[in-house]
Amino acid sequence: MNGNIITETKENITDAGVKKSNVKLINAGTTLLSFKLSIGKTAIAGKNLYTNEAIAGLCLENEEKVLNKYLFDLFNSKFIDLEKGGFNAFGKSLNSEFLRNEVKIPLPPKNIQEKIVSEIEVLEKEEQEKKEKVGVLKSEIVELFENSLNGDVKNYRLSDDSIFEIGIGKRLLKDEILSNGKIPVYSANVFEPFGFINKNLLNDFSRDSVLWGIDGDWMVNYLSKNIDFYPTDHCGYLRIKDNQLNEKFVAYFLEKEGKKFGFSRTNRASIDRIQNIKIPLPSLEIQKQIVSQIEKVENEIEILKNDLKTIPEKKKEVLKKYL
């Protein structure tokens, strides 16, 4: 549940199961609200359905007074934020009594609700269009890579230590992380620093580095030369000794090949497995051309993503304007 319309679920219930249980039918269009773990997450029932005990259906007794979509917008925009007050803490859950007695729903006239819904739908349309554009641009990146392999390529095995330097970091204890540290520490998430420290594990940062997460969600990042970083034992790093290879291009292909291998939290991207990977690469000139084109596309994606980050607050502003 993530603000979407639900029409299909992983699990289904039979007619016999309905008769033996106390589940109640929830009508299409009803706002769905998560009760447990991911408290406050919302969705809309895309058709008549039943839910388990972790999901509440906010069924309306008087649809002449309240619009279903207005109710959804209140919760989905976090205008009514159930995550506040510690109710999203592990082991805690909401219940119907709390919703009935503690959650206050602002109820403007129906024509105001309609204005709110209409203005938020404009933002939702903008949001959807930008998400689709991001998808198109990501497909363009894939196409650029695929096209780069149409000519002459050479296969490089990452175990070739005459070309590649590959290693993993060292375990850090929490008390080694410093509030005033300057050097970012990377763990399984190679995009967001785990913390900061004031000592180095590696001594040479004169070459670009490619980082990958060993036992988290599969991800690969690229760091320019002269940027210090500290890898933990959940982070692998790769450096290239051959000037005929472009580090960014290698990073892109490593990410692609890692997906083929199915690296994940359970299928660890250990050094042995990484070294078994072969990467097909075109000439250095083509590598640089492709990287330059991809960087332009990535800049467009970043602009769109930044725009998307502003939309939730814009939805809140619509609600604040009328309420």
Q: What do these predicted regions represent?
A:
Residues 4-11, 27-28, 37, 44-50, ...:
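Basic, amphipathic alpha-helical recognition segments used for DNA target recognition
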Residues 33-34, 188:
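A generic structural signal for residues embedded in beta-strands
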Residues 104-191, 280-323:
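Non-catalytic DNA-recognition/assembly elements of restriction-modification systems
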